[in-house]
Amino acid sequence: MQRREFLKNSAILGSVALFGGALNLNANSQNLKGEAMKFITLNDGNKIPILGYGVYQIPQNDTQRCVEDAISVGYRSIDTAQAYQNELGVGAAVNSAIKGGIKREEFFITTKIWVSNATESGVLRSFEASMKKLGLDYLDLLLLHQPYNDVYGAWRAMSRLKNEGRIKSIGVSNFYPDRLVDFAINNEIKPAVNQIELNPFHQRKFDREIAKKYGIAVQSWASFGEGRNDMFNNPILKKIGEKYGKTVAQTILRYLIQLDIIVIPKTTRKERMVENFSVFDFELDANDMQTIADIDEQTSLFNDFNHLDPKTVEMLNGWKLPD
């Protein structure tokens, strides 16, 4: 199916939900079509929806509207970060939904500690600031955004907050296998999640194997590679999608979901939120799974942002969040 055709159809569906009163805001873990969500059980026993909504690069003044749209579609897992500078909008949307009847426990809210706050005292201080912006009593998942600064001191503070019940789960982001293994071995509480770049052209098989060995769930950022490599027009992905009457975006998300990879696609358009959520009514067969596995180029689509490059490390350490 062409994405344009799907967007036309889903725009109609979205309008019905917005103006026709057909949406059940209390429908737990279902989208507009009533398709059931799948959950991943983390190593601490907590459960995270395998499909969530990411707000990276969404301006603060547009975040509340986008998250409200996502919630109306059926998303309950929302991924933000201190560095995104839009926690206020996320919190406003989530709290509005709670006042509207959705239970707090239906949501799974994630934020991340930025590099400049990645110290023991920095975590404690910045966590309180994030929670004030989010307007929540507890957080479902707190991640270290980057593997830099005093990550062990930061982890001690995160572990303390988890033990106090302020955070349900703690994890990391952008940790390469060597750092992840060292972190898992030398901390009493292992990361529950490692959020990394992962898409059809950069599938990180070795990273996934290491994470599985240590019981750490893998979460994908940039599942669509921000459209790089002309991903949405890839003939292999298009052909597979057409077989199931699905778009390339849906095919990618379904592929990752069947690998038990948590996905958090971002879009500001409600019809695409619907599109991205409509991935639980089909299943890729083994041949199609292997075909997509074979297009892996085993290289990042963001080589201008290489976490192993000293210049990138200098840049990320030098970037301070505004007060």
Residue ranges and their predicted role:
Residues 123-143, 160-164:
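CE4/NodB-like, metal-dependent polysaccharide N-deacetylase domain
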Residues 22-49:
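C-terminal segment of N-terminal export signals and the immediately downstream linker at the start
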Residues 5-26:
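N-terminal export signals
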Residues 59-70, 119-133:
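Short, acidic/polar
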Residues 51-60, 113-119:
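Active-site mouth loops of central-metabolism enzymes
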Residues 146-323:
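Beta/alpha (TIM)-barrel catalytic core signal, keyed to glycine-rich beta->alpha loops juxtaposed to Asp/Glu
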Residues 53, 78, 139, 170:
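Glycine-centered flexible beta-alpha turn that most often forms the glycine-rich phosphate-binding loop
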